[in-house]
Design a protein with these regions (language model features):
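Hydrophobic lipid-interacting interfaces of membrane-associated proteins
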Residues: 33-39, 65-70, 99, 139-145
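Predominantly extracellular/secreted and cell-surface proteins with exposed
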Residues: 45-121
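Bacterial Sec-dependent N-terminal signal peptides
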Residues: 1-27
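Tryptophan-anchored aromatic micro-motifs
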Residues: 23-46
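A composition-driven surface/loop motif
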Residues: 38, 95, 122-141
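Edge beta-strand at a domain terminus
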Residues: 23-31, 75-88, 131-167
Length: 167
């Protein structure tokens, strides 16, 4: 009888914790309009530009259109996003999305672990004056024709287009 009660308690706690995790992840869901800045392609700084990132059900998406001699549009699709109680974001995704080149083919975006003193993915979301604010730093690379490593990085700060969820 004690084992059944203990098992029931464990199941109840698992359900509660799973529910809390889902609430933490979805309370920040929304479209974040802001500025992509510190955009670097092959180490060369590109101009800042307006863009939107969408966070929905643990997936972060956004697109950086072709800039200058970039081979195409960078399409971020970062899955497995979790948000801790302090707003720190983590991902379990093995890659960051793709780059669509010349409207013909896609190349995978990999996390770049070689950038000095920076993690390949940094994300933070918080409420500021009743509005959700998203801050990102993404260090990535792609392989052109599977041979040439092309590094890139982008930072982003934006505000949610919907009011922050009440705590």
């Amino acid at each position: 009888m004690k084992q059944i009660r203990l098992l029931s308690l464990c199941l109840l706690l698992c359900t509660v914790f799973a529910s809390l995790k889902a609430q933490v992840n979805t309370q920040f869901d929304g479209d974040y309009s802001g500025t992509a800045y510190n955009i670097k392609m092959k180490g060369k700084l590109k101009p800042s530009q307006k863009m939107v990132f969408r966070l929905h059900n643990g997936v972060l998406t956004g697109a950086v259109p072709k800039i200058g001699k970039m081979p195409g549009t960078i399409l971020f699709s970062i899955k497995g996003i979790s948000i801790s109680s302090d707003g720190t974001m983590k991902t379990s995704a093995p890659n960051a999305g793709s780059i669509k080149m010349m409207e013909l083919f896609n190349s995978t975006l990999y996390w770049d672990n070689t950038v000095k003193n920076e993690a390949p993915f940094y994300g933070h979301v918080q409420q500021v004056n009743g509005t959700n604010v998203l801050t990102l730093r993404l260090n990535i690379y792609s392989k052109v024709a599977g041979l040439f490593r092309v590094p890139a990085s982008v930072s982003f700060k934006g505000k949610s287009q919907r009011p922050a969820a009440k705590k």
